[in-house]
């Protein structure tokens, strides 16, 4: 039988099966398209795909480019309805097809951001193998510290300190792992489904009625801690050259080492850090704007019992595993602080050390470490294709040219504000790249004095790091949190993140502007 006949028979059987089940091809296609996403969402995505080519040939590439950015932001905002990769990816493919960008530009953006991709592939996976130790550490903190205000302070300050020596994305991955561990412990306890082979953490119908209110309170508690920790990573990440990917870029252009970067940024970064931590405390004291959720006693007891049981069951091999994790943690901080290699390569080293010395040698067990990060890595590459559109169509050029025309402190504040606004809607690595390259050109042309050039670099650094906490779009760590397996469990949607980040955004941005104006 020929290949043609085989294909024809398969097609006939499929069509016959559809006919027997009274499902038309069109209806089956609609059902399969974006899966279980709501019909209104599917309709909107199809409308976007139809609209873009029409706009391309009627109003031109510039307007269509801005419309595409808005459409892509919509897919991010609806992350809990449909993971942004399929829908956002369709928009990105169409952008290439209709000529808003090209495959070479997309590849170039990916090439420029290879350190970020390596970080996602290997550093996040490396943290997976440290999860046991990190959950143990943070669980001890949670069970020993009963004050929510103190917990908010600790999560914020620990996120800041860790991200100053690691990077914000890695620290966010740590906090996600910890929160997921907390949630899993109580959700499994509260489940009426005690056959754990059929237990599903994503469903609440198996939760005993008496625990429903405690579970909702616990979700609010974790949402609060996640936001305190995530904002903390942005606060600390702005202070050092390893904290954020764009910091490395700025430091390399300015020829700053670790100490130079910290000292130059300190007049703005330290006041913002202090005010950010104080904001966390104030939000919990006042129970304002969605904060103030407390840890229910039933949850605390379950977690304490789990900790005590695990402590009692831990043998010598278990303790040695924790020691190995602690040693690898020190190696990780030391390697990143001195920037001995690219972050992702250091992450691969950590994977090798932890798997070798803790006996994780099965491919299946190692593979689980990459499940969390790789979908987001693919999404980030799609995001870079949108960045390629921004670059190719010069969407930000008018704003950049206007800012460069200003002088003195006005220019510093304008740099901070323009970087901040653009970082809210775009990737802050891209924004920093564009502004630093344009500023470098102006400096090399003799249009900027060296002292002012240093200040402009700080304004770009703080502008891309501070207001960008407003939405998940600007900070890769925030987007990683939004699209993580934890977010739907604790009901942390796009708009909920925007809402919870708003007090931080306002206070930190005002502090950043004032520090840039009077202290820089």
State each model region's role.
Residues 139-148, 367, 403-406:
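Membrane interface segments of multi-pass transport proteins and intramembrane proteases
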Residues 1-125, 264-401, 499-520:
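Hydrophobic transmembrane alpha-helices of multi-pass small-molecule transporters
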Residues 28-29, 105, 132-146, 186-213, ...:
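Flexible loop linkers connecting adjacent transmembrane helices
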Residues 484-507:
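Interfacial loop-to-transmembrane junctions
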Residues 120, 124-132, 136, 148-151, ...:
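Transmembrane alpha-helical segments of multi-pass membrane transport proteins and ion-pumping complexes
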């Amino acid at each position: 039988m020929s290949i043609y006949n085989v294909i024809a028979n398969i097609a006939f059987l499929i069509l016959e099966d559809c006919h027997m089940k009274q499902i038309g091809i069109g209806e089956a296609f609609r059902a399969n398209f974006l899966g279980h996403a709501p019909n209104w969402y599917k309709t909107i995505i199809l409308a976007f795909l139809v609209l873009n080519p029409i706009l391309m040939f009627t109003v031109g590439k510039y307007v269509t480019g801005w419309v595409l950015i808005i459409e892509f932001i919509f897919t991010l905002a609806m992350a809990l309805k449909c993971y942004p990769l399929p829908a956002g990816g369709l928009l990105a493919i169409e952008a290439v097809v209709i000529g808003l960008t090209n495959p070479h530009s997309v590849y170039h953006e990916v090439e420029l951001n290879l350190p970020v991709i390596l970080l996602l592939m290997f550093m996040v996976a490396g943290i997976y193998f440290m999860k046991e130790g990190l959950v143990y550490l943070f669980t001890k903190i949670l069970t020993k510290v009963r004050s929510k205000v103190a917990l908010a302070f600790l999560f914020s300050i620990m996120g800041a300190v860790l991200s100053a020596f690691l990077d914000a994305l890695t620290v966010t991955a740590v906090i996600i792992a910890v929160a997921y561990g907390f949630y899993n412990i109580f959700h499994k306890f509260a489940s009426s489904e005690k056959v754990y082979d059929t237990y599903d953490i994503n469903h609440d119908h198996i939760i005993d009625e008496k625990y429903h209110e405690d579970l909702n309170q616990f979700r609010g508690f974790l949402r609060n801690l996640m936001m305190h920790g995530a904002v903390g990573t942005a606060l600390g990440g702005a202070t050092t050259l390893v904290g954020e990917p764009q910091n490395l870029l700025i430091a390399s252009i300015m020829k700053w080492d670790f100490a130079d970067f910290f000292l130059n940024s300190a007049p703005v970064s330290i006041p913002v850090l202090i005010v950010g931590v104080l904001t966390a405390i104030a939000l919990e004291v006042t129970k304002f704007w969605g904060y103030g959720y407390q840890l229910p006693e039933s949850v605390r007891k379950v977690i304490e019992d789990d900790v005590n049981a695990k402590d009692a069951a831990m043998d010598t091999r278990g303790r040695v595993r924790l020691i190995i994790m602690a040693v690898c943690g020190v190696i990780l901080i030391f390697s990143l602080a001195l920037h001995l290699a690219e972050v992702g390569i250091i992450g691969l080293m950590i994977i090798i050390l932890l798997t070798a010395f803790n006996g994780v040698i099965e491919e299946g067990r190692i593979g689980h470490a990459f499940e969390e990060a790789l979908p987001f890595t693919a999404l980030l590459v799609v995001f870079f294709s949108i960045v390629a559109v921004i670059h190719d169509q010069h969407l930000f050029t008018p704003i950049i040219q206007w800012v460069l025309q200003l002088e003195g402190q006005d220019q510093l504040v304008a740099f901070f504000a323009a970087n901040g606004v653009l970082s809210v809607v775009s990737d802050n690595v891209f924004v920093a790249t564009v502004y630093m390259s344009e500023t470098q050109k102006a400096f090399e042309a003799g249009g900027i004095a060296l002292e002012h050039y240093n200040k402009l670099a700080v304004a770009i650094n703080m502008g891309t790091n501070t207001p960008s906490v407003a939405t998940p779009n600007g900070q890769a760590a925030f987007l990683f949190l939004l699209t993580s397996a934890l977010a739907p469990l604790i009901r942390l949607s796009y708009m909920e993140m925007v809402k919870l980040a708003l007090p931080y955004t306002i206070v930190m941005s005002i502090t950043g502007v004032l520090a840039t104006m009077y202290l820089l």
